[in-house]
Every structure is written in structure tokens, then in C-alpha cells.
């Protein structure tokens, strides 16, 4: 049955590999179950309800990805988009969270229509192959940087970024943490990177997952030994699961279906909606390009088969997520961790979806996994994705320069979509001015995208 539905042999994989890949993807994404409620709670939303909405949106979206496209990609409320929702739209612009949810809902409906009419698929296929490889490399650097940041290995400083020290961390965050709070977690994260690296070199099956679990276990040992001292006020929580509230599922009632359609025809609403549309569109395309390139899923023309199903799953998940009460649900770049473990079909996604469903009942366990334990996974996955740099044609500067711009923009501007925007602009402008555009037969859609991106930077 699994073979027939997921075409395992055709995709050169087996059930064991797919399930392990799905578990790995979930473990690298589980942090969203803790982070999203924390961010959304800043708007006044009930954090328990947001946790339930987050888990359900991830469950439904990832399951739809498996059904519609048979791809090993997982979905959940996106980082960055949730921060824009909370800190810009609600806190910054002064709108209610219900109003912001309505914008997310409208975005989802528009994306469903765009997915059904092939607009999103056309955008995906219009991007040149060298630029697609660059997107994969850029995402690799981006998620490696996110991992280093989550582990506090790099912190803010006088040079913008610097290597960790307790003093630098305290100054950057305006707190008074000690070595037993933050210092030991940095050491554990570094140990985790080394351990995971050793497991990768030894080709141990499930190396990324084992790296997460071993790092977490070392943290628990340090907590028992008194080397790690939890301090909730500073964001350093106990590494032990907290079952004091039992296994009950937090109610969705406070946020379910709370859409506010009054004022949706205002200029502000259109601006908010466009921002959600833009970031989600190109973050999703960037993730699909990067992860599928790493998994060798692109065909000879650089196209991703069944992309319409993948984009439709993403759009429907966003719409459903808004009704449930969470920000934009999108394809997660952490899906690359499962792909690195050999995940190639929707069975990986189904496994991840099931674990998100189970997390509703076992939230204390999943919420106990600290960011320093998942950070090594992100760093190593970044290495895997960086390997696509060999597919970029560096002998042709008209191809190499746009690829370079795309790669460095993602980590430097902390945005996958910005990397794509700048890469597309650089590609079109450079090839147009140097007279290479006609020979390469750059698609009309690439010109349209470049113009739209330039207008975005001018007016937004």
C-alpha cells in the first residue's frame, strides 16, 4: 500500500528511510511549537490556543503536501511572517490581531487562485537554473546562521556580530545572564555540532536526529549536575518535560474563526496583504527550489514536477491556519534536514504530520527540546545545501554575479525572499546591459519580476 501510494521504489527510497527522515524534519521544526505561541502572545492572543492552532496548521498543511504532491516537505506557521504579524501589523500599526488574521486569510484565498491558474508555477519555472542553485546555497548559509544565532554562538556586538561571550550576550540583549544560563548552552551547542559532524562522517543512519537527542541528553545531565541553571525570566527553561498540567489539549475557542472584515478595503489593509503575499510567495518558492535542488528532484529543465500540488497545499494550509488562529503557514526550510536523511516522498511528510498531531497530546516533551539542541542540525543541514555551489557556472560572470548576490543577500538581510529579489534584479539588469539577455532567451516573466522587485524597493 505504501509502495503504491508514495511510489517508494520509483523514488529510490524505502519506508524505514522515509519515516526516519520525517522524524528528523519534525525534530528540527519542533521549536515552532514553542516560539510561535510566544511571538503571537505579544498581540494579546491566548498562547495555549496558539499552540494548538500551530500544531493543527502544521499537521493539516504537511498532510496536504503529502496528498497533493507526494513531496517530503513540511509546513508550519512561518518564522518572520509571525514576527511581521505581531510586531509590525498589530503592535506597530495598531491593528487588532483579528484584523491581521483576516489579511492572512485573504492571502491564502488569493494564493489558492494563483496556484490553480499556474501563476506561482510559472514564476518557479521562470527562474534560471544557476539562480535556483544559488537559492539552495543561500538558504544553506541562512539556516546555518539561524542555527548559530539560536545557540548564541554569534551575538550582536560593536562589529554588528561577534563570537559569543557572556558579557557580549548580556549587552546585546539587555539582560544579566550567567555562564550557568547561557554559557553552558553555547558549549553544549558546539559539542552538538562536533558530535553531529562525527556521526555524519561515520555515515551513521539518522545522524542529525541522533545529534539533536544526544545534545539534549547532555543538557539534561548538565542540569542535574548544576552546570545548567534554568531561569525562565531570561528565557532559559528547564530541559525536563513539564507534565504538571497533564496531557490535555489547550482550547482553540479564544482565537478560532476570529476574522474581522471591517476595514478590509483600506490602503493599509492592501499594504499589509501585499507584504504577506510577497514574503510568503518567494519564501515558499525559495524553499521549494533550494530543498528540491538538494534532493535532485528538479528535471533537466530545472522544473519541479507536481509543483502545482505543492503550492496548492501551501495556499490551503495558510487559509486553514488563519481560521484556526495563526499567522501564515508556509513550507519550512528545515524540510532539508529530512531530505538530507534520505526523505524523497510524501511518506516523510505524513510522518512529520503525524508527529505534529501527537504533539497536541505530548506538548510537554516536544516543548522541552531546547534551541541549542536543534542548532547543530541547522548548521549541518546548511553544509549539505552549500554543496550545490558546485552546480553554479562561475566561468560565466553574467551567471556568477547574480548567483553571488542571491547567496550573500539571504544571510546578510536575514531573508530568503530578499535574496531571490536581489538575485532576479541582478540577473536581468546585468544580462540586459551586457547584451546577453537575447542569447539566453530570458523569459518575459523574469523581466516582470525584476520590475516588480525594483518597484517594491522604491515604494515599500
Stretches found by the model and what they are:
Residues 58-79, 110:
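Juxtamembrane transmembrane-helix boundary signature
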Residues 1-49, 212-307, 451-454:
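Helix-loop-helix hairpins and the membrane-proximal interhelical loops
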Residues 23-30, 63, 67, 144, ...:
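Hydrophobic/aromatic residues within the transmembrane alpha-helices of Major Facilitator Superfamily
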Residues 44-63:
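Loop-to-helix transition at the N-terminal end of transmembrane alpha-helices
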Residues 93-214, 350-460:
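Membrane-embedded alpha-helical modules
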Residues 12, 16, 191, 270-274, ...:
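Alpha-helical membrane-protein architecture signal
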Residues 2-36, 57, 78-87, 91-139, ...:
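Helix-loop-helix junctions within the multi-pass membrane cores of secondary transporters/permeases
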Residues 19, 39, 123, 206, ...:
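Residue-level signature of catalytic and energy-coupling elements of molecular machines
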